[in-house]
From Swiss-Prot:
Its EC number is 3.6.1.41. Belongs to the Ap4A hydrolase family. Transmembrane segments: none annotated. InterPro entries: ApaH (IPR004617), Calcineurin-like_PHP_ApaH (IPR004843), Metallo-depent_PP-like (IPR029052). Keywords: Hydrolase. The gene is apaH. It is an enzyme of class 3 (hydrolase). It catalyses: P(1),P(4)-bis(5'-adenosyl) tetraphosphate + H2O = 2 ADP + 2 H(+). Hydrolyzes diadenosine 5',5'''-P1,P4-tetraphosphate to yield ADP. The keyword Acyltransferase does not apply. It holds the Pfam family Metallophos. This is Bis(5'-nucleosyl)-tetraphosphatase, symmetrical.
Length: 282
């Protein structure tokens, strides 16, 4: 009964299956955690969603910014870009079923027994765990409702970038979405910076990676996240696990077996390009 945590797949379905075969993943007894961004860039987004959906209770996933963008394309709000390679998924006979399932997936996973949390981009140091849970539920409730296109149309944007319990309406939902799915850097007070994508050693002062700023969640729980491929899984404090290693850019797909903290990797089938590219609101 093992727990396997895997970074952003981005439609690299063949690499995912090869990695799961490598670790001898058994859905009947094991659990698979996925950091989000299941789709886009790689050629297998349709197969990816079909497979993950078929796993039922054997998978625990969180939504990433590319998953939300796919939902916006599906709702007719955003444009389908050829480089995202989403057309086979959008035109599939089971597209409605798959995407309505996808929009009902969470932004946050918490395992109290393991003291383990997963979110696509991480957890802002401005939140305690109760706030993070409440904020995740706010967005999840809208996404799973009939009014989800209205939210998706308003989610794009960088402001507000500072948390306050007084935030309400679409401004509150946009901050929550950015914190869970787009965050990389923060100011020392925890305020989000939505612009810098430099590597941590080249980040302009006073910005710091979100995980370098102490917060109540990171002090009590381990946190697994994806989103930040240029970290290459390195440079995080103890208990913080960066799992996106850029498979869709030609890097690797990385898996962490939680019980013994052993890593496994599957090389990408694509040519190396570790740049972040033109990610969606990334």
């Amino acid at each position: 009964m093992a727990t396997y945590l895997i970074g952003d797949v981005h439609g690299c379905y063949d690499e995912l299956i090869a990695l799961l075969q490598q670790v001898e993943f058994t859905p009947d007894t094991d659990t698979l955690w996925l950091t989000g961004d299941l789709v886009a860039r790689g050629p297998g987004s349709l197969d990816m969603l079909r497979y993950v959906k078929s796993l039922g209770n054997s998978v625990r996933l969180v939504l990433g910014n590319h998953d939300l963008h796919l939902l916006a394309v599906f709702a007719g709000i955003s444009r389908n870009k050829p480089k995202d390679r989403l057309t086979p998924l959008l035109e599939a006979p089971d597209a409605d079923e798959l995407l309505n399932w996808l929009r009902r997936q969470p932004l946050l996973q918490v395992d109290e027994e393991k003291k383990l949390i997963m979110a696509h981009a991480g957890i802002t140091p401005q939140w305690d765990l109760q706030t993070a849970k409440e904020c995740a539920r706010d967005v999840e409730a809208v996404l799973s409702s009939d009014s989800y296109p209205f939210f998706l149309d308003a989610m794009y944007g960088d402001m507000p970038n500072n948390w306050s319990p007084e935030l309400s309406g679409l401004a509150r939902l946009r901050f929550i979405t950015n914190a869970f799915t787009r965050m990389r850097y923060c100011f020392p007070n925890g305020q989000l910076d939505m612009y810098s994508k430099a590597s941590p050693e080249n980040a302009p002062a006073p910005l710091k990676p979100w995980f370098a700023i102490p917060g109540p969640v990171s002090e009590a729980y381990s946190i697994a996240f994806g989103h930040w491929a240029s970290l290459e899984g390195k440079g995080t404090p103890e208990g913080i696990y960066a799992l996106d290693t850029g498979c869709c850019w030609g890097g690797e797909l990385t898996c962490l077996r939680w019980e013994d903290k052993q890593y496994f990797v599957q090389p990408s089938n694509r040519q190396m390009d570790m740049g972040e590219g033109e990610a969606v609101n990334a």
